Amino acid sequence: MSSYFVNSFCGRYPNGPDYQLHNYGDHSSVSEQYRDSASMHSGRYGYGYNGMDLSVGRSASTHFGASERARTYPANSTSASTEPRYSQSAAASHSPPPDPLPCTAVAASPVSESHHGVKNSLGNSSSTSSNSSSSTHISRDGVGTSSGTEEDTPASSEQASAPSDQSTAQPSQPQIYPWMRKLHISHDNIGGPEGKRARTAYTRYQTLELEKEFHFNRYLTRRRRIEIAHALCLSERQIKIWFQNRRMKWKKDNKLKSMSMAAAGGAFRP
């Protein structure tokens, strides 16, 4: 239970003699408006409660500084002479407690009276040992829980990264749609390892269109060759070579036909 909770609970029940908060010591030494948690000694818990901060990693020697930081918010109980001591930073609370105040200062202000009560409670060896053991136990539990959360965090991150790795591994091979395929075999391997150009395979549609064009005109202008190349998804070089080969074949066929006709005509001569 922190000192903030105790102070807020005491403010809810301002009448000290009518309501004693969990047997927290003598109510006569505490003002009605503000009940100091450091001057209350709990009979329920097995240690002297002096307003210590039960956070992780604090030692028993810093209880005095923690109780001072816990009492900074009530304005009516702080004096101008002790304000610089209460405005210390969190890093300064790890230092050993300051020197005790003189007896005149103890009798002067209620805050110094609470300091005296803290000193008396710290003077008890059994309560100090129980404080140190309880704070050590709490710090161990806190460290254990924090380490558990830190161990759970990498496991959850690994589980989250596993599906992402699977999702990134799936699209490694892009899907090829039909309109991405070429209608003819690629002729990029002209300068192959064997020095031979691969034979270009034309589709049935491409061969039919080229035969139609050759039937109308055996020679093509460059403009017409570009149009046919775009229409058949071929290059100008392929169109030119196909027409050259087709003309050579046509000449050969005509020569054989003429030779056969000549031979046949000579045989039927009288």
UniProtKB/Swiss-Prot annotation:
Compartmental location: Nucleus
Coiled coil regions in record: none
DNA-binding region: 195-254
Biased composition (Polar residues): 74-88, 144-173
UniProt keyword terms in alphabetical order: Developmental protein, DNA-binding, Homeobox, Nucleus, Transcription, Transcription regulation
Domain of life according to the entry: Eukaryota
Name of the protein this chain belongs to: Homeobox protein Hox-A5
